[in-house]
Amino acid sequence: MQYFEDIPIGQKQAFGSYQVTREEVLAFATKFDPQSFHLDDEAAAKTHFGRVSASGWHTCAMTMAMLVENMKGRKQAGLGSPGVDELRWLKPVFPGDTLRCETEVFEKRRSASRPEMGIFKSRAKVFNQHDEPVLSTTSIGLVAVRDQNAEITG
């Protein structure tokens, strides 16, 4: 199990391989972001996207799927997240793309009010199969500490 104490500042990881399918793009857009450029080839061709593209929120969901799969593989003692500080959609994601993720932890601290919990911040970048960045985010993670009675330092 990976606890707060096991996560060093500067830790970098590269992981994931998410195949974006047309069916999934259309299903997500139909339910959550039914704009024509996510659903209709003809309408999308007339936009700056040029063709049907995934919703940015769908790209976030695909990113989350890769992050959680990586966390499960490392058996991280994750306790959720209070949110995201920054989110940027850098390039459209299209059916047929293959996504991967890179992360780096840049800050961490023990919670003063919840001694059983550590807080860390990380940057994530998602790339397509051409190594073009399509999404970047700065997020906050909560993770269990190994010994909540230990002195609260970093």
Model-derived regions: residue spans:
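HotDog/MaoC-like acyl-thioester-processing domains
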Residues: 2-9, 92-154
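Mid-chain, well-packed structural core segment of small domains
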Residues: 73-97, 101
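Hot-dog-fold acyl-thioester-processing enzymes
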Residues: 1-83, 148-154
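Generic structural detector for well-ordered beta-strands
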Residues: 14-19, 88, 140-142
